[in-house]
């Protein structure tokens, strides 16, 4: 038993929770969480992958939108904001990578912990809402092309994007209260990805509200838009048109992101919180360990959207792909004399792409 207590102290597990995964305190009892080595290496490995690919992909995307995609269309505004949200998130990953390689001993202070969790949730729900905006924009362009001409302007997209940022920051602000650091019995510091036990019940209510209004409702809107888009593509004569191809890519990529990244995370986060609250009998301890381990897997999957979104810009945007190819060719031939002035070339490119794609181009 003494060896078990020493092992518990080294691993950050509460010693009184070791006996069969069950603890008997003065007034309450609860299951312990058996953390395996897999959990210490899985998340930092995923975060390293996301940081490298997400940093490069979103840097290129932001560079393209700022310097090579002018003038922007409405959908370009949404995609730029999506890339910006992803880029801000990947900048926070080095601290998390160090945290997990350091056996989850947080050394950066309480404020940085709160900011870390806040930015993660801002990226998570900001990405969901911007993907919803992109889907609604594409729906109106495909299903109601004439009625939507005035609604797809860049100015309206700027207003909607500003509203999205304000809404997300306001809704996620409570994370700054719920998250934070805590001291384990072995004196190491944890950075809560949810909250401490004392705030768990109110956090569960808050988490359910954000899940319903910031995930479930947007997901239903996206499914409705894509169902109507697919119906329109079937019945309209859009064979081999750029709009048809871009719409199909958009449907596939966004639904894949939701199925792989967002949906599993929200399901397992809710189940993990429920287990911490109510599944605290001796018979449920092994089940709770499995729920917690699976939840950690989905946390890694939830971060993958930051490196998958650049694929959306490339595959679902003919204009983005052409201008990226043109920009890379121009950078490799800077020493060659320009035959055409920059303004003439830009005018020609804009007229050509507008003729091919209209206002829904990207």
Swiss-Prot record:
Residue sites binding ADP per the record: 35, 192-194, 272-276, 292-295, 299
Origin: domain of life: Eukaryota
Membrane found in the keyword field: yes
Gene Ontology terms for molecular function: A1 adenosine receptor binding; ATP binding; G protein-coupled ADP receptor activity; G protein-coupled ATP receptor activity
Tissue specificity: Mainly found in blood, brain, and lung. To a lesser extent in stomach, gut and skeletal muscle.
Gene3D superfamilies associated with the record: Rhodopsin 7-helix transmembrane proteins
GO annotation (BP), single: establishment of localization in cell
GO cellular component, one term: plasma membrane
Keywords: ATP-binding, Cell membrane, Disulfide bond, G-protein coupled receptor, Glycoprotein, Membrane, Nucleotide-binding, Receptor, Transducer, Transmembrane, Transmembrane helix
Ranges per topology, Extracellular: 1-40, 99-114, 178-203, 274-292
InterPro entries (alphabetical): GPCR_Rhodpsn, GPCR_Rhodpsn_7TM, P2Y1_rcpt
Subcellular location: Cell membrane
Cited PROSITE patterns: G_PROTEIN_RECEP_F1_1, G_PROTEIN_RECEP_F1_2
Disulfide bonds: 31-285, 113-191
Membrane topology: Multi-pass membrane protein
Residues the record marks as carrying a glycan: 11, 26, 102, 186
Membrane-side (Cytoplasmic) residue stretches: 64-76, 137-155, 227-249, 315-362
TM ranges: 41-63, 77-98, 115-136, 156-177, 204-226, 250-273, 293-314
UniProt function note: Receptor for extracellular adenine nucleotides such as ADP. In platelets, binding to ADP leads to mobilization of intracellular calcium ions via activation of phospholipase C, a change in platelet shape, and ultimately platelet aggregation.
Family assignment from sequence similarity: Belongs to the G-protein coupled receptor 1 family.
Protein name (record): P2Y purinoceptor 1
Organism: Meleagris gallopavo
